C-alpha cells in the first residue's frame, strides 16, 4: 500500500521544502504547489491514490485570504470535501492579524481542521498530520 499523500500549497519555496522533508521523515508522500490554482487543477484531475489524504495550505499567497478561498473551493467539491485541511500562515507576524482558531466553529468557518502560525513547530505539526491522515 502506498504511503499517504499530502498536497502542500505555499508560495514560499523554502517552507514547501521544509514541510516536504518533515512529512517524508514521518512516512508521507508529498506534492508541492506554489499557487492554489495549480493545486485545484491537480485535485480536479486526481483519482484514487492520486487524491491526497491531507492538504496543507498557506493563508497568504497572491492575496491575503488565498488559503481561505482555496479551502472553500475544496469544500465545495463533493469529491474533495472530506479531505482534511491544515492552514499555516505568517499572517500574525507579517500583518498583525490573529486568525488562530479558538473553537471548532472558528475552524469550520475557515473550512479547515487545524490552523498553525508560522514558524510551525515540527512536532506539533506532525502530531496533527498523524491525527488527520494516519
Give short role names for the model-derived ranges.
Residues 50-53, 79-86:
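His-Asp phosphorelay/catalytic-motif detector in bacterial-type signaling
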Residues 16, 62-64:
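The feature encodes the CheY-like receiver
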Residues 65-69, 91-116, 123, 127:
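Alpha4 helix (beta4-alpha4-beta5 surface) of REC/receiver domains from two-component response regulators
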Residues 58-59, 89:
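Active-site residues of response regulator receiver
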Residues 10-11, 58, 118:
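Acidic di-acidic motifs
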Residues 13-31, 110:
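Two-component/phosphorelay signaling modules centered on CheY-like receiver
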Residues 32-54:
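Acidic, metal-coordinating helix/loop segments flanking the phosphotransfer/catalytic sites
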Residues 41, 66-81, 102:
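Short amphipathic alpha-helix used as the core "switch/output" element in two-component signaling
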Amino acid at each position: 500500500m502506498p504511503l499517504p499523500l499530502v498536497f502542500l500549497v505555499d508560495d514560499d519555496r523554502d517552507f514547501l521544502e521544509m514541510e516536504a522533508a518533515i512529512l517524508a521523515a514521518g512516512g508521507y508522500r508529498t506534492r508541492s504547489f506554489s499557487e492554489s490554482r495549480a493545486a485545484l487543477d491537480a485535485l480536479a484531475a486526481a483519482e484514487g491514490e492520486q487524491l491526497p489524504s491531507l492538504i496543507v495550505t498557506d493563508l497568504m499567497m497572491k492575496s491575503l485570504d488565498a488559503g481561505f478561498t482555496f479551502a472553500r473551493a475544496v469544500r465545495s467539491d463533493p469529491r474533495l470535501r472530506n479531505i482534511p485541511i491544515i492552514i499555516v500562515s505568517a499572517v500574525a507576524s507579517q500583518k498583525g492579524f490573529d486568525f488562530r482558531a479558538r473553537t471548532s466553529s472558528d475552524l469550520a468557518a475557515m473550512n479547515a481542521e487545524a490552523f498553525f502560525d508560522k514558524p510551525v513547530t515540527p512536532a506539533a505539526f506532525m502530531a496533527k498530520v498523524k491525527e488527520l491522515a494516519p
